Curated annotation (Swiss-Prot):
Organism: Influenza A virus (strain A/Goose/Guangdong/1/1996 H5N1 genotype Gs/Gd)
Recorded topology in the membrane: Single-pass type III membrane protein
Ranges facing Virion surface side: 1-22
Pfam families: Flu_M2
Chain residues carrying a lipid of type S-palmitoyl cysteine: 50
A GO CC annotation given for this chain: membrane
Top-level taxonomic group: Viruses
Family in the record: Belongs to the influenza viruses matrix protein M2 family.
Function comment: Forms a proton-selective ion channel that is necessary for the efficient release of the viral genome during virus entry. After attaching to the cell surface, the virion enters the cell by endocytosis. Acidification of the endosome triggers M2 ion channel activity.
Endoplasmic reticulum listed as a keyword: no
TM segment ranges: 23-43
Protein name (record): Matrix protein 2
Length: 97
């Protein structure tokens, strides 16, 4: 019996769905997949900025500064900053970590 042939019958307190296939493993699996899909979609919409920012920028780190003296690190930061400074009134956002 397909889901389109379900019959709803009024009872004393509520509407009840008479469906003989509700214990079918395929129906149970489809219900579980549907619920998981809904949960994942809601989480994606709530945290999409965090998730996609992590995927976009989290995997692309700058050059490693391990073992480099602090003076050279500061010099590198200043070079990077001066390379993007524009005197035309344009603004450039730089994220230094």
């Amino acid at each position: 019996m397909s889901l389109l042939t379900e019959v709803e019958t009024p009872t004393k307190n509520e509407w009840e769905c008479k469906c003989s296939d509700s214990s079918d493993p395929l129906v149970v699996a489809a219900s579980i997949i549907g619920i998981l899909h809904l949960i994942l979609w809601i989480l994606d919409r709530l945290f999409f900025k965090c998730i996609y920012r992590r995927l976009k920028y989290g995997l692309k780190r700058g050059p490693s500064t391990e073992g480099v003296p602090e003076s050279m690190r500061e010099e590198y930061r200043q070079e990077q900053q001066s390379a993007v400074d524009v005197d035309d009134g344009h603004f450039v956002n730089i994220e230094l970590e």
